[in-house]
Amino acid sequence: MTRIGTPLSPSATRVLLCGSGELGKEVAIELQRLGCEVIAVDRYGNAPAMQVAHRSHVISMLDGAALRAVIEQEKPHYIVPEIEAIATATLVELEAEGYTVVPTARAAQLTMNREGIRRLAAEELGLPTSPYHFADTFEDYRRGVERVGYPCVVKPIMSSSGKGQSVLKGPDDLQAAWDYAQEGGRAGKGRVIVEGFIDFDYEITLLTVRHVDGTTFCAPIGHRQVKGDYHESWQPQAMSAQALAESERVARAVTEALGGRGLFGVELFVKGDQVWFSEVSPRPHDTGLVTLISQDLSEFALHARAILGLPIPVIRQLGPSASAVILVEGKSRQVAFANLGAALSEADTALRLFGKPEVDGQRRMGVALARDESIDAARAKATRAAQAVRVEL
């Protein structure tokens, strides 16, 4: 039986977010709608989720002692990681001491880097993946590329949003790809994965919810990546019944192995009826932002319900829908957005402006959402809305 108290009172149900970006912001809002007290933690101040949380803390998320100090101070009922780069060994310790980590500390630890989850999927679960090789040194990396063959992809074992990721078409790309991966890694100390290139038709995110009554799948989400970073997503992605069934089989296997309750973003490659496992996030997925307009319960609402042990009797997909990212390039601590009336002038459109405190280089600062009669029409409408937004640095 789920019981939720009153925020800021002795009966409060406290949820602590480890990471406070745009996905965490939506999770915080959904948890507050259900009466939770939300504490947001991240490495920089005024992060999006902090702007809607009851309280916030700024610490290095990779500093285990600092993370433990905040958690022991706040005594949350649920610890909810929103990013990969966290001191996961500390989460494992805290879970052993009786804290609840969503979905589990092991899931956070295995998915913190590409090696843990790839070895689980391919070697323990026997799921289909691309050929791969892990390397710590340039020489080992070169051997790995020779073994996997061209074209191939090299990525730091720890990075997000495509940082440090590149495609190698031949030996001339070896050094540049290695150097870029070394710059893009967050905390993997130079280790990389070399992956064989799968000639897929499309890639999907299958949002998979492990909740009190079992496992439920959202309709598949198609997406377009630029240099490994999401720019556009849509739901539903058209696919054969056989490919969908295989996608659900793979997603169920990997999420069952990770355990716990919550929403997972399972990334898959699809060619015809064949499916390969790519990656999994044990939390809402950026491509799933489309669910803010495509479903009656967004991925964030589903995550909140699953965390709190509430039922999810049905997930209604509302028709062809799309999201298009609002990217900002430049340097500013006072970004403003104009021409919003034009961006929202068409029916069935919406915007989310994330409220990130600064941009230095290129940063995802918002997303446009749209529904229409077909996926092509929804994508075009979302793109028009995103492009209509005028950014002032």
UniProtKB/Swiss-Prot annotation:
So what does this one do?
Involved in the de novo purine biosynthesis. Catalyzes the transfer of formate to 5-phospho-ribosyl-glycinamide (GAR), producing 5-phospho-ribosyl-N-formylglycinamide (FGAR). Formate is provided by PurU via hydrolysis of 10-formyl-tetrahydrofolate.
ATP-grasp domain residues: 119-308
Under the heading InterPro entries, the entry gives: ATP-grasp, ATP-grasp_carboxylate-amine, ATP_grasp_subdomain_1, PreATP-grasp_dom_sf, PurT, PurT/PurK_preATP-grasp, PurT_C
Query: Where in this chain does the entry annotate a coiled-coil region?
Result: none
Q: Name one GO cellular component term.
A: cytosol
- Entry protein name: Formate-dependent phosphoribosylglycinamide formyltransferase
Subunit (UniProt): Homodimer.
Root EC class: ligase
Lineage of the organism:
Bacteria, Pseudomonadati, Pseudomonadota, Gammaproteobacteria, Pseudomonadales
